[in-house]
Structures are given as C-alpha cells and as structure tokens.
C-alpha cells in the first residue's frame, strides 16, 4: 500500500463501539462538547461521534451566537436558517420541527470508508451520530452524513474528511496590504492518490557543427509525483460536492447502499432568498442552479456589502473544520501582479476548492 494509506492504518485506533471518540472534544475525545463544525477530520481507524449542533454554534464549550445571529445592516440575513426557519438554539433538537429519527450516509468517495452509521438519542441536547472507520478500509477520503426526521426530511449534514496530513502545520501568507494569514497546507477535503517515483536518468547527446563534435551528458533528476483531488463547494453552502477524478469526470463515489457511481450531482432550481437556503440544507447533494445572491453574510456573519473585505466571522454555513474558516476576500491578493481579488462579479455562480 501507499505510504499515506499505511500511515492511516498504523495510527492508534480511537474510541470504541460503546464509547466512540467525540470529534467535538479536541482535548481527549470525551463527552464534553468543546468546539463544533460542519467538517470533522479523522486521521486514524476507530469509532467516532459528533453532537447534534449546527456548524460552529458551540465554541469553547458555550453557545456561539455570533455564528448565526448578527445586527449588521446591508444585504444580510440577521438570523441564519435551518431547514425550517430561523435558528433559535445551537442544538438541532432544541429547535422547532427538528426531531431526529435516523442518520445515514449521503455519499462517500472511497468504498466502505465509513460504516455503522447510527443516530443515538442519548443524554441531553439530542444525542449524537456515531460511525466506524475500519483499519482494513481506511484511506484518504470524504463522506457526508445526514440526520433525518421520521418521514425522511434531512435536517442537517456533516462532512467527514479522512486524511493523514496535519492540517495545523499552517503556512503564513501576506496579502497586498501587508496583512498576514495562516492557511492550511491543503485544500479543504484534499486527498492524495498513489505516489509515483521517477528514477534519475541520463543520456549522452552528440552535437555536430561543421567539422566539430561534442558529446554532452543530459541528466534528469529523480522526481516524486502524487496526484490528488478535493471536493467542490457552492457559495454559502456547508456541504461538499463530489470531486473530479483529475479529468473532466467525477471520481467514483458510493451511496448509502454501497452502489458505485460517477454521476454528477443533481442540478435543480432550489428557489431564491430564504427558500434557497432552506432547500440547500434539505438537499445537500443538489447543486442549486438558481442565480441568487440575496444574502452576502452566509460565510461571514457581518458582511453586508459586496467588495468590502470585512474580517470574517465564521458562520454555521462555513464548511471548514475546527480552527479554520473561509478566508477574507483579499487574503490572496499578494499572489497577483494587480493585487486584486480573483472575481468581483456580484451575480456570478462560484465554485470553491
């Protein structure tokens, strides 16, 4: 097996079936909910769980109201929505019409990467979802898990990212204005593929000009190449879409029944405004074709005007794991000669990787 897969298989397993490792407890995986997110990172085999909390609505063990409420003015949604209406509490089951019955896989891009998914209605605040990552099948990959009401309505969904890489070995970058940012070494959801090694080679080349000749040695240095992939994101949404396989095609993914597919996500008009937000939550694997940009604060709660690089305050729709957030709009301006943002069109449909 490849080194990146070996590293995952050899990692010390976490949790047990009776006591799964709580991904929202960064101290020791215990029962206390410390920090939540829409994306949880797994780097070892084992049994895992996460609480029924909207995105990052719990921070440092307390309610993080700024993740879903704002008094900002402009083109903003002052209280962010769940599938039904404005959120009133960080814990899903403490909101109206949010009784959870089950949990299931939406998709995963590695066969049997995540198994034994179940909803456990235990303890306070709506219990938790647990799942297993087996040593025999662990490898870099992505999965989306959703919880449902009794009639099958999706209430919320989370991204599980399995990787051996250390996301917290950040790189410091500086934008055009001299502001510094610490960024992850990987795109969100990045998974490396098989590693290819190329040995050093050399050959003799003879040059002849007129009556003179000269033989030169051309040497090619050894090289290491690792292709990979990462999922795609639609503006303002928390859930990833299946990645490309490196060509103009979708990487093979598997549904809840283990059936493989290379089909693109469903594309559908999911409405506009408040209805668009609710329908995106209800349909995490449907790409919204409706060209609606009514609210500018879906990924930064206080952002009320286009083209203004206000400090990002992470929201419950942010797709990043604990410790990270969507960067400010001018974070990468130091990379371009013009020192401008990559796209300033207000009505564009954007993909993010």
Regions found by a protein language model. Give the residues of each.
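A short beta-turn/strand-edge loop motif at beta-sheet boundaries
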Residues: 57-58
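Conserved positions within compact, well-structured domain cores
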Residues: 4-27, 36, 44, 73-135, ...
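Generic detection of short hydrophobic beta-strand segments and adjacent strand-loop junctions
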Residues: 42, 48-52, 160
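Structured alpha/beta or helical-core interaction and ligand-binding surfaces enriched in interleaved
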Residues: 36-37, 53
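Terminal domain-start segments
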Residues: 65-68, 81
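Short acidic/polar inter-strand loop motif in beta-rich domains
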Residues: 151-155
